[in-house]
From Swiss-Prot:
Name of this protein: 2-C-methyl-D-erythritol 4-phosphate cytidylyltransferase
Disulfide bridge map: none
Keyword line: Isoprene biosynthesis, Nucleotidyltransferase, Transferase
Catalytic activity reported: 2-C-methyl-D-erythritol 4-phosphate + CTP + H(+) = 4-CDP-2-C-methyl-D-erythritol + diphosphate
EC number: 2.7.7.60
General function of this protein: Catalyzes the formation of 4-diphosphocytidyl-2-C-methyl-D-erythritol from CTP and 2-C-methyl-D-erythritol 4-phosphate (MEP).
GO molecular function, a single term: 2-C-methyl-D-erythritol 4-phosphate cytidylyltransferase activity
Site, Positions MEP for the nucleophilic attack: residue positions: 165, 221
NCBIfam families: ispD
Species in which this protein is naturally found: Colwellia psychrerythraea (strain 34H / ATCC BAA-681) (Vibrio psychroerythus)
Family in the record: Belongs to the IspD/TarI cytidylyltransferase family. IspD subfamily.
Pathway: Isoprenoid biosynthesis; isopentenyl diphosphate biosynthesis via DXP pathway; isopentenyl diphosphate from 1-deoxy-D-xylulose 5-phosphate: step 2/6
Length: 243
C-alpha cells in the first residue's frame, strides 16, 4: 500500500486477565516460547508503516523489564490506568500529534492480527478521512437474555428476544482515529462519566463516524485458557504461509 505517513500504535497492557486463571498476567503467557505481548508488539512493529508502539503497563508490572521488549528502541513504556480507557489516554498523552496525526490502538492479547487487515484499515480511514475499526459480521443467531432471580430454585438467564443480526458486528482491534479527536473524545467521555469499552465507543459519544472494516476471524482475543491453543494454531499457520 502507498502512504507517506507513519503510524504509532498504543497497546494497553495493564490488565491481569483473571479469566485465564494463570499465575501471571495473560499477556506474559508464552506461545512458542515467546510472550503473547511480544508476539503482538513485534507483529505491529514489523508492519512497514508502523514506526513505534506505546505499551501501557500496570504500575506493579514485574514482567516487562525482564522481557525481550524492554530495551527495544521503538517501544515506549507508559503507566497504565485503572481501566483500559485510562491506559489508552495515558498513551495518547505520550503521542506527538504533529508527528503522528493518526493513532491506532490494539489489544495486547490479539497477537494474530495480519498485516493485510492493518493495511485495509489504514487505507480505508485515510481515504474517508475519519476513523474506523477492524470488525467481523455476526454470523450466529443472537439472543437477548434476562436474569430471573429465584431464591428457591436458583437464578437463571432466559431468552427475552431474538436480536436481528444483519447489522451487528464484533468489534476487534486495531481501532484507528485521528490522535487529537480520540484524545478529546475520551477526555469528554470520562468527564461525563460515560461507559467507554473501546475507542469506538468514545468516538460514538462524541457523535463522530466510525468505519467498520471487515477483518479476518483469525484476529482472536486471548481471553480463556482454550484460546491459547487456537492462537498458537493461527500463529503457526501464518508463519508457514509467509515461508
Amino acid at each position: 500500500m502507498a502512504s507517506t505517513l507513519k503510524f504509532i500504535v498504543i497497546v494497553p497492557a495493564a490488565g491481569v486477565g483473571k479469566r485465564m486463571q494463570a499465575n501471571c498476567p495473560k499477556q506474559y503467557l508464552r506461545i512458542n516460547n515467546e510472550t503473547i505481548l511480544s508476539h503482538t508488539v513485534m507483529r505491529l512493529l514489523s508492519h512497514p508503516l508502523i514506526s513505534q508502539v506505546i505499551v501501557a503497563l500496570g504500575t506493579e508490572d514485574q514482567y516487562f523489564a525482564e522481557s525481550e521488549l524492554a530495551h527495544h528502541k521503538d517501544i515506549i513504556r507508559v503507566n497504565g490506568g485503572t481501566e483500559r480507557v485510562n491506559s489508552v489516554l495515558n498513551g495518547l498523552k505520550a503521542v506527538d500529534s504533529d508527528k503522528y496525526p493518526w493513532v491506532l490502538v490494539h489489544d495486547a492479547a490479539r497477537p494474530c492480527v495480519s498485516h493485510q487487515d492493518i493495511d485495509k484499515l489504514i487505507t480505508r480511514c485515510l481515504r474517508k478521512d475519519y476513523g474506523g475499526i477492524l470488525a467481523t459480521p455476526v454470523r450466529d443467531t443472537m439472543k437477548r437474555g434476562v436474569l430471573i432471580k429465584d431464591s428457591a430454585k436458583g437464578d437463571n438467564t432466559i431468552i427475552e428476544s431474538t436480536v436481528e443480526r444483519e447489522q451487528l458486528w464484533h468489534a476487534l482491534t486495531p481501532q484507528m482515529y485521528k490522535t487529537d479527536e480520540l484524545t478529546l473524545a475520551i477526555e469528554q467521555a470520562l468527564e461525563n462519566s460515560l461507559k467507554i469499552t473501546d475507542e469506538a465507543s468514545a468516538i460514538e459519544q462524541a457523535n463522530l463516524p466510525s468505519l467498520l472494516v471487515s477483518a479476518s476471524s483469525e484476529n482472536i482475543k486471548i481471553t480463556h485458557p482454550n484460546d491459547l491453543a487456537l492462537a498458537e494454531f493461527y500463529l503457526n499457520k501464518q508463519a508457514n504461509n509467509t515461508n
